[in-house]
Amino acid sequence: MDTDLQLALNTLKKNFSGDREAQKALLLLERKIKAQALDDEVIPTDEEPFPLPEDIKIKKKAFALFADGACRGNPGPGSWASMGQDQSGKVLFEVFGVENQTTNNQMEIQAAIEGLLELKRIMGSTLDCEIFLFSDSKYVVEGMEKWIPEWKKRGWKKADNKIPENLNRWQKLDEIKGYFPRLQFIWVKGHAGHPQNERCDQLANHALDEIDFI
């Protein structure tokens, strides 16, 4: 954050030290300013291009997405990150964000949501091609490939008739999946030398490092 802006915020905090609502508003403003700065920041990466996944090398047209979530405390402050590549290997985007109080599973789902939303924004109406979304979360991959079809048959209920955890996020992800008729979710082992997964992990943790949650 700009030094003058930080000094101004600190002065306001001091002047309104006895006003609880003002302190909350200033804290929210500070977080939003830091989050915007993160959006504008380019986080360095190695100069070597990311290797193209085998799944899309043999396709006429395909895209690869990578998604990862992080959480400190679980529940606690969390973050998500996603990146996308086209068939030439070009990195189309990197996006990331933070939430104050969340869980690791929620951030894993959110990473997939945000990656698909960004790809949809870039592609516009050209969605009928193969999309491979790679995640190190079996929770996300099995949820999308196995659990959700069964939940929907039961009116979004599990076999024990209980409502699935994180239902709103699952429903949002399922809704977005509808725009991608040839979307596949693929599990990759985390922290095992997968370059794009490691990059998303780096982005997510960088976002958490830069935002001070109270």
Regions found by a protein language model. Name each.
Residues 1-41:
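Short, low-complexity, charged amphipathic interaction modules
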Residues 70-74, 113-199, 208:
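RNase H catalytic domain
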Residues 12, 196, 200-214:
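Charged phosphate-binding loop/patch that engages nucleotide di/tri-phosphates or the phosphate backbone
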Residues 38, 92-94, 100, 124, ...:
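Phosphate-ester processing/binding pockets and catalytic centers
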Residues 35-59:
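Intrinsically disordered, low-complexity linkers and terminal tails enriched in Pro/Gly
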Residues 20, 38-41, 75, 185, ...:
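Residue-level signal for secondary-structure boundary elements
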Residues 50-106, 114-120, 206-214:
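RNase H-like nuclease fold core
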